[in-house]
Amino acid sequence: MFEHYSVLKEESIKGLAIKPDGIYVDCTTGGGGHSLEIASRLNENGQLFAFDQDKDALAAARDRLSTYADRIVFVQSNFRGLEEQLKKHGIEQVDGILFDLGVSSPQLDRGDRGFSYNHDALLDMRMDQSQHLSAYEVVNEWSYERLVSIFFSYGEEKFSKQIARKIEAYREQQDIKTTHQLVEIIKDAIPAPARRKGGHPAKRIFQALRIAVNDELEVFNNALHQAARLIAVNGRIAVITFHSLEDRICKQAFKKWSTDKPTPRHLPIVPESHQAPFKLVTRKPITADTSELDENRRSRSAKLRVIEKVSEWDHEFTYEEGWRK
């Protein structure tokens, strides 16, 4: 059964400031926990679009949310298709958008999808099972230089070169097919003193592979800019991130959108044309309280940021790669 603990659920729902007759989007439906809270606050005129690229997650959510089926549209799609999918349904503006990033608990706990270093399984890590690229192709076919790049950039792994070199040597003898094989290679590449601290030695590499396979950072950055275009005045965007790379993208975008354009110093007030179209609802990210941390240890790295649109603006919110800097 697809069961998933929804992180920062109360805080994110409060952050969205849901209107009963509003239109909302859950970009990462998962097990449906956040979607359930949103749908239960809508009346017959409200609508929720529940996105997920994982068909198993969407099927489970459909069952869980059957009570509110009259106000939910389920969309099997990566949120990179946010604008395209909503336009198919005649939707050009919405009142709230939620992103809950990262891997869902069932994908980690089941182990058969290759996301977890705690379960032996075929190397996969595809959120969308219909796509070709998997962790197997990345590990066995990508060059040493490319592996070093993703391990360092996406995993912030200081032993990136040593691990990539071990992978390169191993695959010359045989393919690396399973998560267990990869974990042992990683352990062998990291000096013993370093293996004994900082969590599981494979954690950063598995994160890097998952991000690379699913193009997570590029997709999120693109979708966040789509969200800025879609959100109506007084509408809100709420984002739950789980590592510094995602949070950096969100933080930089929110800061830019909530900052007024530069104006001449002699002007007594900021002209309306120079005023930022968004305001920060959360000046600092919200994190899990002690009770949630006791209930779900995966909440410890979660950060919630919320922003509200206060006016239309001539800025196009085009896709940028500034988060890399």
Swiss-Prot record:
For this protein, what reaction is catalysed?
Answer: cytidine(1402) in 16S rRNA + S-adenosyl-L-methionine = N(4)-methylcytidine(1402) in 16S rRNA + S-adenosyl-L-homocysteine + H(+)
UniProtKB keywords: Cytoplasm, Methyltransferase, rRNA processing, S-adenosyl-L-methionine, Transferase
Q: Which GO terms describe its biological process?
A: rRNA base methylation
Does Ribosomal protein count among this protein's keywords? no
Q: Where does S-adenosyl-L-methionine bind?
A: G32, G33, H34, D52, F79, D100, Q107
Show the Pfam families listed in the entry.
Methyltransf_5
Q: Where is this protein localized, as stated in its record?
A: Cytoplasm
Enzyme Commission identifier(s): 2.1.1.199
Question: Which SUPFAM superfamilies does the UniProt record give?
Answer: Putative methyltransferase TM0872, insert domain, S-adenosyl-L-methionine-dependent methyltransferases
The GO terms describing molecular function are:
rRNA (cytosine-N4-)-methyltransferase activity
Recorded GO cellular component terms are: cytoplasm
Give the protein's biological function: Specifically methylates the N4 position of cytidine in position 1402 (C1402) of 16S rRNA.
HAMAP family assigned:
16SrRNA_methyltr_H
The entry assigns this protein to a family as follows: Belongs to the methyltransferase superfamily. RsmH family.
- Protein name according to UniProt: Ribosomal RNA small subunit methyltransferase H
Tell me what organism the protein belongs to.
Answer: Oceanobacillus iheyensis (strain DSM 14371 / CIP 107618 / JCM 11309 / KCTC 3954 / HTE831)
Q: Which gene encodes it?
A: rsmH
